[in-house]
Amino acid sequence: MNPSAESPSSIHTDCAEVQVPGQVFLVIAVASLSENLLVIVAVIKNKNLHSPMYCFICNLAVFNTISSFSKALENILLLFKDAGRLNSRGPFELKIDDIMDSLLCMCFLGSIFSILAIAVDRYISIFHALRYHMLMTMRRVLIILFTIWVLCGTSGALMVGFFEAATVKIFFIVLFFTALLLILLLYVHMFLLARHHANRIASMPGAQAQHRKSGLRGALTLTILIGVFVACWAPFSLHLLIMMICPENPYCECYRSLFQLHVVLLVSHAVIDPAIYAFRSVELRNTYKKMLLSSASRICKRCA
Amino acid sequence: MPRFQLSNSTSVPNHNYEWSYEYYDDEEPVSFEGLKAHRYSIVIGFWVGLAVFVIFMFFVLTLLTKTGAPHPEAAEPYEKRMRLTSCADGLGRQRETDGRTGLSRPLLEESRSLFHCYINEEEREGGRAATDAGALTHGRSGIGNSRGQVEEVGLVVQNMVLESRAEREAALLAHFNIPNFVNSELNSALGDEDLLLGDPPIIMEEARPRCTHHIID
């Protein structure tokens, strides 16, 4: 970018790119890493959580862990570069940059697919409750997870390799909108069934008034789930769309100047995910309590 | 894109080429002159649209909560539920004495017997379950009435436990805490919609293959 070539009048009306300090990324990445590692450890340790639903939640946590790890690594390397210890144009650094970008890409795709898998799994468990264990055997779950990993790995590598092509951006945008639509449909249908049953219970004599409060709570949970998904992924998808459609429009330029903020939102999705999916489970929370108690008792034994 | 100019005198090739690269910014700088609307209008429009979408979705879901009309056949399923609760009552009393062991074997035995009790109740029901099966299974009647009954029982079992959360002792709920299954969220204080977003409800694996084969065959 050659600032001297710009006309003076355009400088102060330009939408300068909003820079987010690297420390913010680092803090978010470290928080996400610790949360998701906790989820993975809890799911592995507790035998009760070796079921299809928790496999998908653990898979989401693994993708989030890898993405936050690579984001943290990228920021550390940027700090080194700012300190002058790294050459930003060297071949080794470019290769590392490509590898980290493809890992990030793979993890973003993987989180979308994992969220979809969790929604489909919940849907099957509600609407085909009695056939659930025939439909979702552990073998099928492992096959699904393997497919997701292979698909995301190759897509991530291809997307970073051919990022200039418009196909990559179109693929990402289409994937986001499809996932959003599917999640909306599945969860709203599940919600409608739950309302139907709650109304039938409420119509019985002796029903309590907590029925309405629980309905509001369900609506709130669903809104948070879908709202967080859209708020974290839509800005980035719109950014890709705008890059393709209007690269020279000043309004679009102002939107594109907020790129780093949109990436912050993407990374913060990895922080919020455990709170929405994993930590809502009572069994997982009990596992944490047991882990804390056992480690506390071990420390006490060493002290005494 | 490189741009080069040939010198005017072509008779003497003195190679007066001028190379320069053109950046898009130099050629067509994004002009911010004369913008009609605010420069961040796309950003503002996007976030306002997103907020409107989320709030609209919340209001729609809340309205669905409030305006759920009572089911016209409310009396009949109530009786059926009372009959089915008798199954759970009998077994619950039996198991209260055992206490809350948390062992898988006795729990599976009891869930098997509970399931058989429900299936027997359903079979005794006869043809009355047609409308209810249709309502509960949402039009999957093509599969067959008995299958619909089985699925209806599954859903009614879900309802049962929803109900029992408020009324029964925790011992009955522990009945459904079958290890290696997705644990039921229903013994927590979450709302019944969180049923969707917590763990799936009662899945009785050992009992089901035998029972469904018995019903479907």
UniProtKB/Swiss-Prot annotation, chain B:
<keyword id="KW-1133">Transmembrane helix</keyword>
<comment type="similarity">
    <text>Belongs to the MRAP family.</text>
</comment>
<protein>
    <recommendedName>
        <fullName>Melanocortin-2 receptor accessory protein 2A</fullName>
    </recommendedName>
</protein>
<dbReference type="GO" id="GO:0030545">
    <property type="term" value="F:signaling receptor regulator activity"/>
</dbReference>
<dbReference type="GO" id="GO:0106070">
    <property type="term" value="P:regulation of adenylate cyclase-activating G protein-coupled receptor signaling pathway"/>
</dbReference>
<dbReference type="GO" id="GO:0005783">
    <property type="term" value="C:endoplasmic reticulum"/>
</dbReference>
<dbReference type="GO" id="GO:0072659">
    <property type="term" value="P:protein localization to plasma membrane"/>
</dbReference>
<dbReference type="GO" id="GO:0005794">
    <property type="term" value="C:Golgi apparatus"/>
</dbReference>
<keyword id="KW-0256">Endoplasmic reticulum</keyword>
<dbReference type="InterPro" id="IPR028111">
    <property type="entry name" value="MRAP"/>
</dbReference>
<feature type="glycosylation site" description="N-linked (GlcNAc...) asparagine">
    <location>
        <position position="8"/>
    </location>
</feature>
<dbReference type="GO" id="GO:0031782">
    <property type="term" value="F:type 4 melanocortin receptor binding"/>
</dbReference>
<dbReference type="GO" id="GO:0031780">
    <property type="term" value="F:corticotropin hormone receptor binding"/>
</dbReference>
<dbReference type="GO" id="GO:0005789">
    <property type="term" value="C:endoplasmic reticulum membrane"/>
</dbReference>
<dbReference type="GO" id="GO:0034394">
    <property type="term" value="P:protein localization to cell surface"/>
</dbReference>
<dbReference type="Pfam" id="PF15183">
    <property type="entry name" value="MRAP"/>
</dbReference>
<feature type="transmembrane region" description="Helical">
    <location>
        <begin position="42"/>
        <end position="62"/>
    </location>
</feature>
<dbReference type="GO" id="GO:0070996">
    <property type="term" value="F:type 1 melanocortin receptor binding"/>
</dbReference>
<keyword id="KW-0472">Membrane</keyword>
<dbReference type="GO" id="GO:0005886">
    <property type="term" value="C:plasma membrane"/>
</dbReference>
<dbReference type="GO" id="GO:0097009">
    <property type="term" value="P:energy homeostasis"/>
</dbReference>
<dbReference type="GO" id="GO:0031783">
    <property type="term" value="F:type 5 melanocortin receptor binding"/>
</dbReference>
<keyword id="KW-0812">Transmembrane</keyword>
<dbReference type="GO" id="GO:0031781">
    <property type="term" value="F:type 3 melanocortin receptor binding"/>
</dbReference>
<keyword id="KW-1003">Cell membrane</keyword>
<dbReference type="GO" id="GO:0040008">
    <property type="term" value="P:regulation of growth"/>
</dbReference>
<comment type="function">
    <text>Inhibitor of melanocortin receptor 4 (mc4r), a receptor involved in energy homeostasis. Plays a role during larval development in the control of energy homeostasis and body weight regulation by decreasing ligand-sensitivity of mc4r and mc4r-mediated generation of cAMP, leading to stimulate growth during larval development. Acts by stabilizing an inactive conformation of mc4r during embryonic development, when all the energy consumed is obtained from the yolk sac, possibly to speed the rapid maturation to the mobile free-feeding juvenile stage reached at 5 dpf.</text>
</comment>
<dbReference type="GO" id="GO:0006112">
    <property type="term" value="P:energy reserve metabolic process"/>
</dbReference>
<keyword id="KW-0325">Glycoprotein</keyword>
<dbReference type="GO" id="GO:0106072">
    <property type="term" value="P:negative regulation of adenylate cyclase-activating G protein-coupled receptor signaling pathway"/>
</dbReference>
<dbReference type="GO" id="GO:0048589">
    <property type="term" value="P:developmental growth"/>
</dbReference>
<comment type="subunit">
    <text>Interacts with mc4r.</text>
</comment>
